């Protein structure tokens, strides 16, 4: 067979090259893109076309987003902000948007470089864990809903104590959840307190449920000067379902025993009437919620890694949060390196990654975006849209429904290849027999 290949090389070279082209065609691209015009992007300064500065830089040079998309109406972005930052802190931007295919390129504006801690001897790593859990919930839910926005949550508290701000660090002040001060008629924090709140107007709500995980010491107004173990819960008064957890760590808020900080879980709650209950220490309850509306057929979100140049410390919490099957993560292998604006804005590789938003593709999958829906040498994993060699892959089930056109095309190509090989074998065998007879 090897000798035959050598003899056939001039005639079979084109056939072999043709097969190579067919089976190396339509590779997945490392971009974020969309199947149609029903898409939306949540971002920060790298996609904020409204940001204004007067420092002599070229207009829009801070963008990773192509400026052609500035007037698309499909972008909600704010310089210096993020969904997580707006959710928890006074520094708020009213993110809102709707689409079938949702893309996130934000998160870096709350990172280890900010070093936020709730208390003087708190733990920023606890906040990185909060960030990961927050985005995991957001990504999971936005694979099932079209619309995301923020809403305020009002509450009714029967006591005399007022809200207090106990989580402040540098420029950030926490206001979600809200903490209720100790009632003046109690000498310590060993008492049960509660407040009612109502969630209405959305299909689901993402709210924080947080505790100070460790041993909290009472304030200077607490004569008992004791340590307390935080315990918080939300009770759905309509369904009877209780959500809650307690402090579990043996840490405090002192130089000798640091680490006490807020640990949050992010609940997806249905509309209804709720009661927030604290069995010890400070009562907390949500003041803001992410409003989820308009359920849709399952469509994974796409998340672009949001990080600084290596001169500033970043985290990988959006990558931790972005898990299959509800999320596809996109990144580059190089350090983020900005151009004319500064090192943190205008990276060439991230601009290439976001350039996929300029056009539609046929298929979005774990490996990337497939431009065409005919054939590919890479099988789309968790593919959505009209994917090469296969149509939609169902949720949680890697079983493909074959698209007949690519299969027929492959069959035709295979049939032609077999016929050509048989013809060439017959031709050379006949030619060899004639020459042998003449010899």
Swiss-Prot record:
GO BP of this protein: fusion of virus membrane with host plasma membrane
Residue ranges the record marks as coiled coil: none
Spans annotated as Esterase domain 1: 12-132
Effect noted on mutating residue 281 to A: Decreased receptor-binding activity
Keywords: Disulfide bond, Glycoprotein, Hemagglutinin, Host cell membrane, Host membrane, Hydrolase, Membrane, Signal, Transmembrane, Transmembrane helix, Viral envelope protein, Virion
Intravirion side: 429-439
Places the protein is found: Virion membrane; Host cell membrane
Processing and modification events after translation: N-glycosylated in the host RER.
Disulfide bonds, paired cysteine numbers: 49-70, 118-167, 202-291, 210-264, 322-327, 363-387
InterPro entries cross-referenced by the UniProt entry: Capsid_hemagglutn, HEMA, Hemagglutn-estrase_core, Hemagglutn-estrase_hemagglutn
Annotated region described as Esterase domain 2, given as residue ranges: 282-395
A single Gene Ontology CC term: viral envelope
EC number: 3.1.1.53
A Pfam family matched in the record: Hema_HEFG
Stretches of the chain found on the membrane's Virion surface side: 23-407
Active site: 45, 342, 345
GO terms of molecular function: host cell surface receptor binding; sialate 4-O-acetylesterase activity; sialate 9-O-acetylesterase activity
Domain of life according to the entry: Viruses
Function: Structural protein that makes short spikes at the surface of the virus. Contains receptor binding and receptor-destroying activities. Mediates de-O-acetylation of N-acetyl-4-O-acetylneuraminic acid, which is probably the receptor determinant recognized by the virus on the surface of erythrocytes and susceptible cells. This receptor-destroying activity is important for virus release as it probably helps preventing self-aggregation and ensures the efficient spread of the progeny virus from cell to cell.
Family listed: Belongs to the influenza type C/coronaviruses hemagglutinin-esterase family.
Assembly and interaction partners: Homodimer; disulfide-linked. Forms a complex with the M protein in the pre-Golgi. Associates then with S-M complex to form a ternary complex S-M-HE.
Protein name: Hemagglutinin-esterase
């Amino acid at each position: 067979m090897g000798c035959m290949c050598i003899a056939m090389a001039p005639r079979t070279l084109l056939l072999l090259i043709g097969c190579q082209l067919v089976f190396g065609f339509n590779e997945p691209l490392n971009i974020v893109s969309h199947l149609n015009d029903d898409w939306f992007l949540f971002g920060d300064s790298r996609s904020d076309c409204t940001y204004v500065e007067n420092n002599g830089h070229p207009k829009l040079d801070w963008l990773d987003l192509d400026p052609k998309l500035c007037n698309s109406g499909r972008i909600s972005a704010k310089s210096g902000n993020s969904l997580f930052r707006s959710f928890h802190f006074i520094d708020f931007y009213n993110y809102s948007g709707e689409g079938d295919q949702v893309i996130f390129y934000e998160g870096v504006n709350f990172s280890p470089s900010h070093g936020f801690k709730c208390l003087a001897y708190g733990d920023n790593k606890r906040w990185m864990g909060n960030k990961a859990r927050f985005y995991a919930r957001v990504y999971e839910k936005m694979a099932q809903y079209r619309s995301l926005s923020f809403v305020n949550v009002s509450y009714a508290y029967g006591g005399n104590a007022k809200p207090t701000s106990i989580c402040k660090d540098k420029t950030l002040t926490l206001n979600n959840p809200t903490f209720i001060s100790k009632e003046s008629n109690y000498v310590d924090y060993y008492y049960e307190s509660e407040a009612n709140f109502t969630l209405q107007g959305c299909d689901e709500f993402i709210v924080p449920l947080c505790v100070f995980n460790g041993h909290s010491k009472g304030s200077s107004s607490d004569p008992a000067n004791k340590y307390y173990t935080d315990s918080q819960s939300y009770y759905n008064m309509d369904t009877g379902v209780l959500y809650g957890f307690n402090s579990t760590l043996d840490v405090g808020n002192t130089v000798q025993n640091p680490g006490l900080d807020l640990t949050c879980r992010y609940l997806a709650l249905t509309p209804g009437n709720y009661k927030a209950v604290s069995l010890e220490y400070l009562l907390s309850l949500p003041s803001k919620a992410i409003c989820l509306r308009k359920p849709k057929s399952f469509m994974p979100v796409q998340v672009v890694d949001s990080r600084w140049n290596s001169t500033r410390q970043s985290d990988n919490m959006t990558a931790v949060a972005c898990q299959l099957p509800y999320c596809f993560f996109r990144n580059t292998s190089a350090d983020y390196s900005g151009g004319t604006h500064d090192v943190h804005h205008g990276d060439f590789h991230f601009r290439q990654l976001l350039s996929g938003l300029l056009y539609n593709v046929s298929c979005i999958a774990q490996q990337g975006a497939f431009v065409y829906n005919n054939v590919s040498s890479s099988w789309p994993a968790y593919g959505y849209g009209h994917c090469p060699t296969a149509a939609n892959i169902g949720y949680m089930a890697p079983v493909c429904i074959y698209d007949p056109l690519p299969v027929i095309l492959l069959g035709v190509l295979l049939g032609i290849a077999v016929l050509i090989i048989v013809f060439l074998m017959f031709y050379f065998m006949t030619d060899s027999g004639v020459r042998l007879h003449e010899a």
